Amino acid sequence: MKKLFNFIASLAVLFSCDTFAININLAADKSNLNIGDTLELQVRVSGLDDNAAPSLGVYDLNLGFDATLFSLNAVHWGDSVLGNQLDLAGFGSLQESTVNGSWLNLFELSFDSVADLDLLQAGDFTLFSVLLTAQAIGEGNFSLWINSIGDASGNELSIDEPNGLAVIVGGVEVPEPSGFLLLLGALAIFALRVRNLQYPR
């Protein structure tokens, strides 16, 4: 009976941890692109409860990318649909982005009150989007490193390990001429030769 109780208790703890697991992950708008194409990377948080504590109030992240394959274009803060979930009351937020070689550091601190963040913030949303341009052929690997992340009061949140992803950059494809165009070209050359035979210079 005691073993059964311990087993049930262990399952309860396991499911409880899974239920309240908070994740920050990378998502790309494409997995294959050509030189000159633009890639959009989104960094998303999930696992928070809608309109309830804990909410997200501050984060400090490093985004790793291959600087030989991609050049940084822009950083867009917030969710394109839900808006910036760290600026719910319109007071703004402290935002900083710094590039150091193949690392992009992104920091944001909300100026909203604890009550506004806990009561108004969504459970799943995009923190920011990064736009990059492909500039060389190869496989680009992206990684995310969490320096720190805190709730509305600044207390540290427990976060699962972020995912990584890879994107393939290929060369620009040159379209091959269609069979119909090749046939027209051959007919034109044949007609020109026949004409030269009929009307020699």
Please annotate each region the language model reported:
Residues 29, 33-89:
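Low-complexity, serine/threonine/proline/glycine-rich extracellular segments that form mucin-like
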